[in-house]
């Protein structure tokens, strides 16, 4: 069951200086190619970070959930353009603040920059693991690893047999770089091995908590 963690005093202070907005599921929050001027903080919900090729085919790079910053690239180098699309995976409540105002807050309380920096370091580690998985794991391994990662996210729900997640076969394919049909075949194989159960968008990953 998803819970809302108690908020850190520094983050609470930071949020008091932000504009808070709510977005419905499937809303596009950031468009690739637009000028980067705003930092975002996810209070509730989850978003997908994705890129598109010239034909409009999407690849999901990662999911972000409550407590995550995003849109930070232009904070450190002016004139940056957004490099990825951000879309709401579920209804979201998001704090938004201009880079200019955030830089002013850093002067008052540098701890907020440490929060952001710690997240960026963890995200870099996750990206390194993702690149390694793409290079060294076959598609079955990539899908299995993706399911394990999703089972650890805040929106995963406890289930008597493990953790329950909601994701489509198309979304899994966009994350690991394969077709929806391939995902379906591998999920069936994982079911036959009694590692998961999959019914529509609902997947239970056994033995995870």
Curated annotation (Swiss-Prot):
Gene3D superfamilies: Jelly Rolls, Winged helix-like DNA-binding domain superfamily/Winged helix DNA-binding domain. The modification N6-acetyllysine is found at residue 100. Residues 19-21 are annotated as: Activating region 2 (AR2). The record marks 96, 101 as: Activating region 2 (AR2). Residues 52-58 are annotated as: Activating region 3 (AR3). 3',5'-cyclic AMP 1 binds at residues 56-62, 71-73, 82-83, 127-128. It comes from the Bacteria. GO terms for cellular component: cytosol. Keywords: Acetylation, Activator, cAMP, cAMP-binding, DNA-binding, Nucleotide-binding, Transcription, Transcription regulation. GO terms for molecular function: cAMP binding; DNA binding; DNA-binding transcription factor activity. 3',5'-cyclic AMP 2 binds at residues 135-136, 170-180. Residues 153-162 are annotated as: Activating region 1 (AR1). Residues 179-185 bind DNA. Residues 137-209 form the HTH crp-type domain. The keyword DNA damage does not apply. InterPro entries: cNMP-bd_CS (IPR018488), cNMP-bd_dom (IPR000595), cNMP-bd_dom_sf (IPR018490), Env_Response_Regulators (IPR050397), HTH_CRP (IPR012318), RmlC-like_jellyroll (IPR014710), Tscrpt_reg_HTH_Crp-type_CS (IPR018335), WH-like_DNA-bd_sf (IPR036388). A global transcription regulator. Complexes with cyclic AMP (cAMP) which allosterically activates DNA binding to regulate transcription. It can act as an activator, repressor, coactivator or corepressor. Induces a severe bend in DNA. Acts as a negative regulator of its own synthesis as well as for adenylate cyclase (cyaA), which generates cAMP. Plays a major role in carbon catabolite repression (CCR). Homodimer, which upon binding cAMP is able to bind DNA. Binds the N- and C-terminus of RNA polymerase subunit RpoA and sigma-70 (RpoD). The N-terminal domain binds cAMP and is responsible for homodimerization, while the C-terminal domain binds DNA when cAMP is bound. PANTHER family: CRP FAMILY TRANSCRIPTIONAL REGULATORY PROTEIN, DNA-BINDING TRANSCRIPTIONAL DUAL REGULATOR CRP. This is cAMP-activated global transcriptional regulator CRP. It comes from Pasteurella multocida (strain Pm70). The gene is crp.
